[in-house]
Design a protein with these regions (language model features):
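Hydrophobic alpha-helical membrane-insertion signals
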Residues: 2-35
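A short glycine-rich, His/Asp/Glu-containing loop-to-beta-strand
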Residues: 26-81, 152-174
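A short beta-strand-loop-beta hairpin characteristic of the jelly-roll/cupin
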Residues: 63, 78-98, 108, 112
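"Short basic amphipathic alpha-helical interaction patches in structured regions
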Residues: 91-98, 117-119, 143-146
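Short, structured patches in soluble enzyme cores that scaffold and shape functional sites
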Residues: 128-135, 148, 165-169
């Protein structure tokens, strides 16, 4: 069990200090995305390291994907809105993430992985959050799990908003 799983739930609210606009960039083999949380903000937002949003109807913006690259000491959580992305890593994990699905990867002591589109046309859209691991967990064994949309608990608020719970509990749904 990771130390983060033992942490008490957040008990107090914080005020918004500033609104920060994302900026257009590319990563991997040229995937166009919007970077919302950046290295400049990492110390202020730990454990949140980075948040990228990607989305395009033009396959040229995403088709090359994210070829083999290393990670260590943090987790990535990817949520797909549209499209299909294949994950493979050096620890032997593999999976395909489809619309509404979530992929959770703990890099721990280190992993080399790739994320390559499983499509050649159509919309590809989603976002990826990077979470810093506590110091005690930075050298843990790499771990991977993907969840299809049908496996994730969801509900609608009284106002009609759709909520999908990808971690923890929301309104007694977990």
């Amino acid at each position: 069990m990771l130390a983060a799983e033992l942490s008490p739930p957040l008990q107090r609210s914080r005020r918004i200090e500033a609104l920060v606009a994302g900026y257009a960039t590319s990563d991997g083999a040229g995937v166009r995305l919007t970077r919302l949380l950046t290295q400049k903000l990492q110390r202020r937002l730990d454990p949140f390291l980075m948040l990228d949003a990607f989305g395009s109807d033009d396959a040229e913006d995403y088709i090359a994907g994210f070829p083999d690259h290393p990670h260590r000491g943090f987790e990535t959580i990817t949520y797909m809105l549209d499209g299909r992305m294949r994950h493979r890593d050096s620890a032997g994990h593999e999976g395909v993430l489809g619309p509404g699905g979530v992929q959770w990867m703990t890099a721990g002591r280190g992993v080399i992985h790739s994320e390559i589109p499983e499509q050649t046309a159509g919309r590809m859209e989603g976002f990826q959050l990077w979470l810093n691991l506590p110091a005690a967990d930075k050298m843990c064994v790499p771990w991977y799990r993907d969840f299809a949309a049908a496996e994730l608990p969801a509900y609608r608020t009284a106002a009609g908003a759709a909520v999908t719970v990808i971690a923890g509990t929301s309104r007694d749904v977990q």
